[in-house]
């Protein structure tokens, strides 16, 4: 196991396509890990960044989540909640809302619609992508041909590692 300690088993959620603008991922579930890190070991943002780097998830950024529905058809995305709390809509407009707070990790397979519904003022996310997927697209409703989105999703390689737990982590087992 990696430095995060014994692994937290994620909640796995599948979302169906709307058949038009939000393909979601026909084969892979969203993974929601809760309580991955806490502030007892320093900055949660720093812990996520170190873990992502160690496990070859690259292109790290710190910010929030867009407040409009969007998806990335050519990259998987890890969102490490580092501060505050939020309600996120996953799966596009027909999806489901989830409450997340500091220490949670959401891993979105390519094509999964997502947006921020509301958040605390201090809400902060560290985002990252599997090695080689840092040049991702951002698609809003109807901005990418649906068939092209499906082709991009199918062509997006699986990551070799879980963003926190490495090559033996839950993502590798569940998505593998």
Predicted regions and their residues:
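Short, conserved beta-strand element in jelly-roll/cupin
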Residues: 72-89, 107
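A short, N-terminal "cap"/entry segment at the start of jelly-roll beta-barrel domains
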Residues: 1-70, 171-176
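Double-stranded beta-helix
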Residues: 117-176
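A short beta-loop-beta micro-motif enriched in histidine and acidic residues
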Residues: 64-78, 93-94, 100-102
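Conserved metal-binding segment of the jelly-roll/cupin
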Residues: 100-120, 129
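A generic structural motif
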Residues: 89-91, 117
């Amino acid at each position: 196991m990696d430095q995060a300690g014994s692994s937290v088993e994620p909640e796995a959620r599948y979302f169906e396509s709307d058949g038009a603008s939000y393909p979601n991922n026909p084969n892979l579930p969203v993974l929601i890990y809760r309580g991955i890190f806490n502030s007892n070991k320093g900055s949660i943002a720093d812990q996520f960044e170190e873990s992502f780097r160690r496990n070859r998830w690259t292109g790290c950024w710190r910010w929030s989540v867009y407040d409009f529905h969007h998806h990335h058809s050519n990259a998987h995305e890890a969102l490490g909640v580092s501060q505050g709390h939020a309600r996120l809509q996953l799966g596009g407009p027909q999806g489901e809302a989830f409450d997340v707070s500091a220490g949670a990790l959401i891993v979105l397979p390519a094509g999964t619609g997502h947006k921020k519904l509301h958040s605390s003022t201090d809400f902060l996310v560290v985002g990252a992508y599997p090695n080689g997927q840092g040049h991702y697209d951002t698609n809003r409703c109807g901005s990418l041909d649906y068939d092209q989105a499906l082709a991009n999703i199918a062509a997006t390689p699986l990551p070799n590692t879980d963003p926190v737990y490495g090559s033996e982590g839950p993502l590798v087992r569940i998505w593998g």
